[in-house]
A protein has these predicted regions:
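Conserved beta-strand-loop-beta-strand hairpin that lines the nucleotide-binding pocket
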Residues: 1-4, 50-135
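Conserved short strand/loop->alpha-helix "switch" segment adjacent to the catalytic nucleotide/phosphoryl-transfer site
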Residues: 21-43, 98-99
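Short amphipathic alpha-helical interaction patches enriched in hydrophobic/aromatic residues
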Residues: 5, 25-29, 53
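Conserved polar catalytic motif of the HATPase_c/GHKL fold
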Residues: 44, 48
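A short beta-loop-alpha structural element at the N-terminal edge
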Residues: 6-17
């Protein structure tokens, strides 16, 4: 099922995206691990768009496109912020960064999803989770 959302940069608005997308995931019969991976990645990407992208400016929007089928879930999230260079984000697993509070969301997303691409100068993330159990 394809869906489109535009939400304000407000953490309370995340449920407007999360609930229907996760309902589509359930309807498409993803296993428990894949469902967890999609949920965590979607939440992290939305929080990152609001916090780091739009810097919690409620006048700026976050746009989301989702396409969930039994074979794959694709979610695209775009903010109105200045973007970032993914290559310049420090590795949160490196010893010197273990106590730093940032960078883990990106690591989670890239670990849990099958494919992740950062587009439009880091203002947009495209996440794909393949359903390995699809018939």
């Amino acid at each position: 099922m394809k869906r489109s959302f535009t939400i304000p940069s407000d953490y309370d608005a995340i449920r407007q995206v999360l609930d229907p997308v996760m309902s589509d995931v359930a309807d498409s019969r993803y296993d428990t691990d894949s469902t967890f991976a999609i949920r965590i990645s979607l939440e992290e990407a939305l929080v990152n768009a609001i916090k780091h992208g739009n810097r919690e400016d409620r006048r700026k929007a976050v746009r989301v496109e989702s396409d969930v089928t039994p074979a794959r879930a694709e979610i695209v999230i775009e903010d109105e912020g200045p973007g970032f260079d993914r290559k310049r984000v420090p590795d949160p697993t490196a010893a010197e960064n273990l106590c730093r509070p940032s960078g883990r969301g990106i690591l989670l997303i890239e670990s849990y999803m099958s494919d992740v691409t950062w587009e439009r100068g880091g203002r947009r993330v495209r996440m794909v989770k393949r359903n390995e159990n699809a018939a």
